């Protein structure tokens, strides 16, 4: 993306509202032109499209004075399903409560509704913003919808005692290590909290003993030094052993979609084509 052009445009206006995705917020915060924009009038900042990382949210409010209000939606249920109150004064990491006229619930692997607070399950949605179906693809539509008209989002989430939902990860991105579920976003949130890390993506890679292990791709901040050992030490006190990255690869950039979402699929495909499946274990 052409960030200098973005900042030139923003600097010519009084900014009251600003929507974006985590990668955009993060890239802007670390760009030298960020302070050329007058953020003092910013009243509403909405994050969506992907999980907003805690480190990015904290830095954003420190520099602009306006917290990121996170919401949740998807192409099949556009534009929004849940959102935090816009009057909120802090970033919570939750995706909020269902918007008006929308029903949201969690289901287990058998499609049964989960009623216990804090239990993880697939987010299913019913409301006026939910699609009627995929155009001329009845089989795929049938797979995506429940018998009572809920859309199966493929996203894993949880709900707290207040009725606030949290987005954990995509069901298809789940990493299974020795039978234990690992959500990439949890690993990424820990690694990205390191001041030397600009961006990171976690995926599962095949392992003969565990089925899968966690691999993290890391982009360093310009001029900063961070090694594998630094990251292992940081994660050792913050993640259970099976959630810790066992393989770390440093890169200059990470593949992104035109919307700024990281393309895990591309990274997984690159790993599948790698002839060297051996790894060094760290505990």
Put a short name on every predicted segment.
Residues 39-42, 99-102, 197, 245:
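Core-facing hydrophobic residues within beta-strands of well-ordered domains
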């Amino acid at each position: 993306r052409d960030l200098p052009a973005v900042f030139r445009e923003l600097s010519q206006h009084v900014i009251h509202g600003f929507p974006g995705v985590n990668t955009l917020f993060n890239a802007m915060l670390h760009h030298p032109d960020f302070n050329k924009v007058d953020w003092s009038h910013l009243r509403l900042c909405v994050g969506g499209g992907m999980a907003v990382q805690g480190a990015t949210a904290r830095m954003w409010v420190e520099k602009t004075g306006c917290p990121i209000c996170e919401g949740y939606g998807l192409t099949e249920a556009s534009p929004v399903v849940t959102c935090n109150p816009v009057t909120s004064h802090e970033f919570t990491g939750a995706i909020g409560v269902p918007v008006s006229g929308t029903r949201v619930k969690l289901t287990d692997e058998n499609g049964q509704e989960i009623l216990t607070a804090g239990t993880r399950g697939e987010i299913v949605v019913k409301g006026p913003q939910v699609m009627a179906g995929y155009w001329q693809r009845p089989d795929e539509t049938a797979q995506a919808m429940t018998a009572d008209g809920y859309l199966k989002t493929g996203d894993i989430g949880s709900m707290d005692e207040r009725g606030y939902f949290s987005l954990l990860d995509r069901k298809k991105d789940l990493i299974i290590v020795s039978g234990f579920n690992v959500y990439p976003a949890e690993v990424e949130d820990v690694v990205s909290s390191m001041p030397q890390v600009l961006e990171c993506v976690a995926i599962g890679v095949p392992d003969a003993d565990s089925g899968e292990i966690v691999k993290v791709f890391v982009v360093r901040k310009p001029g900063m030094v961070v090694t594998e050992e630094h990251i292992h030490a940081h994660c050792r006190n913050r993640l259970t052993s099976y959630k810790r990255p066992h393989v770390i690869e440093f890169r200059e950039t990470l593949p992104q979609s035109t919307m700024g979402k990281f393309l895990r699929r591309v990274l997984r495909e690159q790993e599948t084509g790698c002839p060297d499946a051996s790894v060094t274990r760290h505990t």
